[in-house]
């Protein structure tokens, strides 16, 4: 399930910027394409439907069939045109719906003590899927062509749909007689929720602001699509897998609170790697080092962050509450990413990467609220 969640995310964040830039799309339009990721932020609006109707497995399989249809349709769409962005929006909407079911299944099938290690494994599979989408597919694009790759990806999702039909689905207590907004009310009534909301909004901001401009930076620095696919994405995402496993283990060992500030601090500092590379003229050593370090620390921080978000959710309302929490940081990230192209075009890559480091810092001011919230829920702090 984690693999099928990671592929769409890798497709959107790793492959699409390379595809658009290699076809001559402007930095401004690539940045604005971040708005197509809005369904990831708004998925809490239909999460109650996923909570109440059907099984987790049925939602996942239906979305995977939808992925196959949309990927096949990309063959007919001009890159950067309106039909392309409509299809991209539909692709993300399917991904967001699938994520609701996958996230809820993870919460329902694990105990709180298992969340750290479970999310380490989950992020690992997620990152492997990102390698498939953003590394293998990008690396093969010159040899096979983009249209053939889209059709191959469509076939992959049909295979995944068949595989997922055989997976177990968690049993959950019915909530049909509860008010529709009960999951939201329960979450908002939690102790210290205001500080928690601000932390969730800001923790991943620097990371999400950085992502849309990384691949254009590689292309504009003179690196080939093959190098981006096989080195920047595959090597980098491979490092993030190691980071995710280490992050899951460290979260279990350190406790969620200490993992958040220690691993989150490493995640923030890693943005300076791309700043150094841009300042020095993008030499291979610094570029490869920046990719590996940024992805490794992203894996560290993400494992701790997911464990924290899941510790805030009740099992009964897992889909809705996790969707609402994840929407918070995605909304902030979309806002930052949407202006990334404009800022980069006007200030240059080096200055923009320095800005993303600054954006990663404000969330740490709200860690005391996080500690209180974890203590109130009996989670490890």
Report residues per predicted region.
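Helix-loop boundary and gating motifs at the non-cytosolic
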Residues: 1-40, 194-199, 203-217, 229
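C-terminal ends and interior cores of transmembrane alpha-helices
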Residues: 61, 65-79, 265-282
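C-terminal transmembrane helical hairpin of 12-TM major facilitator-type secondary transporters
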Residues: 258-305
């Amino acid at each position: 399930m984690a693999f099928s969640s990671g592929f769409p995310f890798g497709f959107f964040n790793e492959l699409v910027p390379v595809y658009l830039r290699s076809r001559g799309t402007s930095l401004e339009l690539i940045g604005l394409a971040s708005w197509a990721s809005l369904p990831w932020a708004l998925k809490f609006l239909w999460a109650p439907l996923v909570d109440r109707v059907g099984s987790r497995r049925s939602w996942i399989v239906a979305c995977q069939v939808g992925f196959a249809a949309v990927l096949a349709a990309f063959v007919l769409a001009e890159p950067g045109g309106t039909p392309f962005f409509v299809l991209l929006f539909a692709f993300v909407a399917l991904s967001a719906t699938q994520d609701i079911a996958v996230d809820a299944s993870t919460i329902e099938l694990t105990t709180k003590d298992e969340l750290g290690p479970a999310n380490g494994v989950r992020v690992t599979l997620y990152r492997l899927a990102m390698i498939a989408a953003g590394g293998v597919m990008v690396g093969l694009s010159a040899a096979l062509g983009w249209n053939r790759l889209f059709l191959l990806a469509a076939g992959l999702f049909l295979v995944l749909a068949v595989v997922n039909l055989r997976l177990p689905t968690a049993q959950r207590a019915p909530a049909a007689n509860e008010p529709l907004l009960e999951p939201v009310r329960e979450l908002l009534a939690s102790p210290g929720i205001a500080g928690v909301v601000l932390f969730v909004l800001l923790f991943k901001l620097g990371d999400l602001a950085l992502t849309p401009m990384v691949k254009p930076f590689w292309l504009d620095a003179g690196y080939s699509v093959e190098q981006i696919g096989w080195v920047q994405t595959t090597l980098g995402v491979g490092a993030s897998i190691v980071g995710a496993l280490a992050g899951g283990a460290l979260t279990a060992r350190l406790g969620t609170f200490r993992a958040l500030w220690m691993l989150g601090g490493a995640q923030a500092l890693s943005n300076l790697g791309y700043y150094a590379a841009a300042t020095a003229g993008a030499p291979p050593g610094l570029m490869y080092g920046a990719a590996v370090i940024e992805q490794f620390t992203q894996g560290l921080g993400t494992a701790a962050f997911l464990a924290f978000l899941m510790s805030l959710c009740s099992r009964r309302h897992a889909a809705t509450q996790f969707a609402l929490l994840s929407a918070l940081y995605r909304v902030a990230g979309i806002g930052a990413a949407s202006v990334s192209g404009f800022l980069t075009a006007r200030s240059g890559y080096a200055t923009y990467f320095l800005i993303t480091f600054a954006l990663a810092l404000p969330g740490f001011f709200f860690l005391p609220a996080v500690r209180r919230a974890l203590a109130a829920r009996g989670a490890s702090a």
